[in-house]
Regions:
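N-terminal glycine-rich phosphate/adenylate-binding segment common to multiple enzyme folds
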Residues: 49-162
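Buried hydrophobic positions in well-ordered alpha/beta secondary-structure cores of metabolic enzymes
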Residues: 11-14, 67, 138, 179
Length: 197
């Protein structure tokens, strides 16, 4: 098997973690006769430093042309990094949001596993943690607060902030379908968070 992998080492500890991950992939390739072709790309703060923007069209094109993307952390210390003095659309995380949209990466799957043996270390109530649990939390990544309009204005002499949470019917449908598909494969119950009214 031969695969092309776009590698975005990112910022902070990202380069160290991705470099070690590539070593693991190389061992897998060696053991099982695979070949991984890596294309090194920039995104986030390192791309701002090199290109003036957190995500370039070239990086998007290379990711789209690859079989997979291996990516490290994006961004840095918001209190000390000069990146966070930039407008929001030029900060490192704008690259992350841009690549998600460009590649259609809308579902973030976050497993949460607690073995019964570790229940005593869990901050949840004993009746919840005693038997352990295996949950998968799915989060939509390309709509809602990530891309909602924000504004600050004076209303009746008081400063007011608005941050909109908007989802299209298609965005809701695709995340619901993904959640049902994953739940069926896990042979578990599916819960959805209620919509605020």
């Amino acid at each position: 098997m031969e695969k092309n992998i776009a590698v975005i080492k990112g910022d902070g500890i990202g380069p160290e973690i991705v470099t070690e991950s590539m070593k693991v992939l190389d061992k897998v390739a060696e053991k099982f006769g695979h070949k991984f072709n890596y294309t090194q790309l920039l995104m986030g703060g390192c791309s701002i430093d090199a290109n003036g923007v957190p995500l370039t069209d070239e990086t998007i094109a290379a990711c789209k042309a690859s079989d997979a993307v291996l990516m490290g952390s994006i961004g840095g210390d918001t209190t000390t990094s000069p990146w966070y003095k930039l407008p929001a659309n030029l900060r490192p995380e704008a690259g992350l949001l841009g690549i998600r949209k460009a590649l259609g990466l809308f579902a973030n799957l976050r497993p949460c596993l607690l073995y019964p043996e570790l229940a005593g270390a869990c901050p949840l109530k004993t009746e919840i943690s005693a038997k352990g649990f295996d949950m998968l939390i799915m989060r939509e990544l390309t709509g809602g607060l990530y891309f909602g309009a924000r504004k600050t204005e004076e209303v009746n002499g008081v400063m007011t902030a608005t941050d909109t949470l908007t989802y299209s019917e298609d965005e809701i449908r695709r995340i619901a379908i993904k959640a049902f598909d994953v739940a069926m494969k896990r042979s578990c119950l599916l819960y959805t968070s209620p919509s605020p009214r």
